[in-house]
Amino acid sequence: MVVSQKTLIFAPKKGDTIMKTIDQILKIKAVVLYILKAFPEGVDYIHLFKVMYFAQQDQLKEYGLPIIYDTFVARKHGPVPALTYKVLRGIEGKADLSSPELKDFADSLNIAISQDGHQLVLASKNAECDMDELSVADVKMLDKWIEKCKDVESFDLSDKSHEDRAW
């Protein structure tokens, strides 16, 4: 549902309402595509979500500003960025992506199944990260957490995110 030309309503869970601007959605999309560039063979949901979470947490500590305005919600395997998760669920056919911006975000991603049966997120063939959406500080923080997380087992990242008292 479009509230104005720049604001969309998005409900991550029944009863919750979160407003996202088109600019916020474009920034989240840029962050996801930037992370996926580091994982050309795809990345599982946990790795994607934890890079986003830890980079966001570190950015808030260091600069007092978030990288993205995605709401992290508590889930079984730790914090999950609600809008990003909704887009992935939409690709799976399990959530409605009613706005053109969310559909465009979904069109920039693919989901595949790994040999061991895990869902992998990949950038679509022609999808490109809009680097104009990312600051130098954003890129530096994302690079730091991509490097820290890339060789760590998914469930170890999940455990690490549970160490945070916020969850």
Predicted regions and their residues:
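Domain-edge interaction signal
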Residues: 1-167
